[in-house]
Amino acid sequence: MIKDAISEAVRDALREKVRCPTMPHPLPSLQATPSSLPTSSTPTSFLPTPSPPPVRKSDSPDAALSPIEDDLDNFGERVGEEIEALGNQCEENPPYVKHFDAWGNRVDDLITCEAWKKQKAIAAEEGIVAIPYERKYGSWSRVYQAAKMILYGPSSGLYSCPLAMTDGAAKIFENDSVLSSELQRSAFGHLTSRKPETFWTSGQWMTEKKGGSDVAGGTETLAYPQNDGSFNLHGYKWFSSATDSDMTLTLARIVDDDGQYKEVCSLLLACNSKIDNQ
């Protein structure tokens, strides 16, 4: 019943009047009958079972709706046939920290299961992060992505969490009108890639002891500029999300030459060795 409710919510998002920033007024709706909707003989988390109730045609152009529905139908089948089993494996095999190697050396490696790694590849192939940045369907690309995430989330074994943070990081870079550094441009390309071998996830390392609801005002981490253009960070983050990500964003205050730091927090890109090598 939960999946049926999710399916109905997804279809409503695509077929009812959805107001987008570039569409201040909805277009007229057309009535559709259940017989005109796609059907599937295989398990899917997109098409309701046994048959959907009458719904209203989307206000989006038919040229956009048809391929979107086809993709969501196919993805729904993949959720039922593959992703849900992987999600169950992720929940049955939570990550853990391996503190020592076989020789007693301190390593502190984060160990994740193979199903978790496979979720990353699937997310790239399906364009779960990439869709809204490709703009293939204009302002409807966000609605399309949201529908796909709704289908994916309940069966993802919580992999939807790092994907949401990855989307947030990509949006930050996209909002930078210049994408001011080669590193930013490279990172944006990886965050929005559909190729598993080049797709990156991003963490968000922001929360400090004084953070509360005022994350910016409670940030005490200081960033000292280095001669090579990087920053040396000094501070305490008591929560670091998506620790296995390929990159992360963190908040800090940049220290100037006089030892003073800005009141407004600056968003910095913290890179691991993988990014440095690419």
Briefly describe each language-model feature range:
Residues 1-138:
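Extended, charge-enriched "interface" segments that sit outside catalytic cores
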Residues 90, 101, 110-114, 162-164, ...:
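Glycine-rich, histidine-containing beta strand-loop boundary motifs that form or position
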Residues 101, 226, 256:
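Acidic surface patches and DE-rich sequence motifs
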Residues 104-198, 241-243:
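Internal helix-loop-helix
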Residues 149-153, 166, 170-174, 188-192, ...:
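Short, well-ordered alpha-helical packing segments
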Residues 164, 199, 216-218, 243-245, ...:
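Short, solvent-exposed loop/turn segments at the edges of secondary structure
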Residues 179-229:
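Internal maturation/activation junctions in enzymes
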Residues 230, 234-277:
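A short core secondary-structure module
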